[in-house]
Amino acid sequence: MTEITKLDPDVAIDLAYDIFLEMAPEHLDPADILLFNLQFEERGGVEFVETADDWEMEIGVLIDPEEYAEVWIGLVNEQDEMDDIFAKFLISHREEDREFHVVWKK
């Protein structure tokens, strides 16, 4: 089995944020987009997190957490915790065949 070259966290964050900006208008409520735009400079966060192993419930496909990076985009509270998540991204580490899945705020 070949070794997977993992995405650099900064690259994963940039990819997720670019996809978020492109797709958010189609997937988020207009009020959430307005809230995000008004609050992002002060409270916004884009975090590279440990890849969860429960993505199968979200996307209907079993994944190997070692093969994907997970990034959350949202707003943080006074305790510096992300309490309003607008999107969770799952991005494959495979550069030649990049896949991504997004769970949008409902």
UniProtKB/Swiss-Prot annotation:
UniProt signal peptide: none
Gene3D superfamilies (UniProt xref): dsDNA mimic, putative (3.10.450.140)
Cysteine pairings via disulfide bonds: none
Described function: May act as a double-stranded DNA (dsDNA) mimic. Probably regulates the activity of a dsDNA-binding protein.
NCBIfam families: PRK05094.1
Family: Belongs to the putative dsDNA mimic protein family.
Protein's name in the database: Putative double-stranded DNA mimic protein PM0536
Lineage: Bacteria, Pseudomonadati, Pseudomonadota, Gammaproteobacteria, Pasteurellales
